[in-house]
Amino acid sequence: MLELYQTENCPYCVRVRGALADLGLDYIVRNEPDSHRERTRLKALSGQTFVPTLHDPERGVIIADDDDKIIEYVTEHYGRRVA
């Protein structure tokens, strides 16, 4: 299942959540702390601490800190986006 590493108030994360909802995709939300220093789980996964970060464990894909690329990826691999 897709995992979205995010913070609640990040506008780029809100955009990705909207796209995932538009596509009707199930995903796991991994809420990260506001402080980059405290994002140890995200750092261990991707080597960086920026959100949004999408992890697709089934395909071995991690897309970090790029809402456009995340939306493009899920649209291409999981269906078309409803605008």
Task: Identify the meaning behind each predicted range.
Residues 1-9, 14-83:
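GST-like domain detector, emphasizing the conserved glutathione-binding G-site
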